[in-house]
């Protein structure tokens, strides 16, 4: 008899255009599917209330009862503000703005069972921050300014 998977924090990615779906697909190509996850794509012509409803439906889809982590693309944007509407006291929710591929790879490879959304969010936020690097920091080489640029 197979044992049931332990409940874990659900993941919703809310982005402009199809960015969220592309990030999930890229993570799956690299490391395998990100469990208990879905994406919501927001288009410019969409009414804000419709975005909020779709984000809520996505949260319902991945909620196993332990809470939701929502990753948005841009702080302060319509997708991000729609995510804020999910913080309504009905279930544990945390939101992180600035989603990137290293965050999703971390989520695909870490065990989210037994953790609260805020704990998962802190881990993912740190991975996202550490993944942003300048090439010159890594190589010690800097671009040479060209004289013809004004």
Q: What is the predicted function of each stretch?
A:
Residues 1-150:
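N-terminal loops that bind phosphate or other acidic moieties
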């Amino acid at each position: 008899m197979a044992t049931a998977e332990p409940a874990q924090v659900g993941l919703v990615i809310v982005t402009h255009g199809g960015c969220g779906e592309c990030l999930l697909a890229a993570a799956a190509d690299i490391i395998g599917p990100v469990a208990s996850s879905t994406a919501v794509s927001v288009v410019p012509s969409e009414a804000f209330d419709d975005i909020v409803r779709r984000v809520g439906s996505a949260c319902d889809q991945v909620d196993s009862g332990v809470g939701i982590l929502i990753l948005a693309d841009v702080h302060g944007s319509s997708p991000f503000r729609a995510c804020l509407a999910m913080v309504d006291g009905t279930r544990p929710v945390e939101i992180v703005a600035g989603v990137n591929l290293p965050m999703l790879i971390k989520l695909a490879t870490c065990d989210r069972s037994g953790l609260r959304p805020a704990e998962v969010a802190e881990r993912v936020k740190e991975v996202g921050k550490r993944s942003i690097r300048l090439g010159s920091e890594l190589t010690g080489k800097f671009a040479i300014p060209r004289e013809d640029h004004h």
